[in-house]
Regions:
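Noncatalytic carbohydrate-binding groove/subsite architecture in carbohydrate-active enzymes
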Residues: 1-153
Length: 153
């Protein structure tokens, strides 16, 4: 698709893949073929690495950049003090604080969110430095966009 767009407008910026959250970043939402790809390519720490590397290979084959912006979505998985992920206690200062504090999952390596992500290891939190590292390793020059997010704040 990006080749067709670039054929019509070489200056168009192509965004992709618009992954929906942490599970999609790490293992493409448990796609069955991802396990085989990962086993055959242990250098890929997560799906983002594989995607960027494949886009770089496609650029090399086509002689032009086919992905301009790595596009991801991120939604907090952090729980409020009530223990719920989508806490609706908007009048409870502690729940509101936890929701607003969860934005730190983007950038703060001293922050540990209370969620299934940290229970599973949180290898790629904070998310922005992890994404930037993958870009720098597999497809330098790619921009980054978080085009959808929700922190329930």
């Amino acid at each position: 698709m990006s080749k067709a767009v670039k054929d019509i407008d070489p200056n168009a910026e192509i965004f992709g893949p618009a992954l929906f959250g942490y599970g999609a970043f790490t293992n493409f939402a448990d796609a069955p073929d991802w396990k085989e790809i990962k086993n055959d390519n242990p250098e890929y720490k997560w799906f983002i690495d594989y995607y960027l590397d494949e886009m770089k290979k496609a650029e090399d084959e086509n002689g032009r950049r086919l992905l301009d912006v790595l596009d991801v979505h991120f939604y907090t998985e952090a729980k409020g003090t009530c223990g719920k992920r989508y806490c609706e206690h908007y009048g409870d200062p502690d729940c509101v604080y936890n929701k607003l504090n969860s934005t730190r999952s983007f950038w703060d390596d001293t922050y540990t969110e209370d969620s299934w992500i940290t229970d599973a290891g949180a290898e790629f939190l904070p998310i922005l430095p992890a994404l930037k590292e993958s870009i720098d390793t597999y497809y330098p020059g790619t921009k980054l966009a978080i085009t959808e997010y929700d922190f329930q704040g």
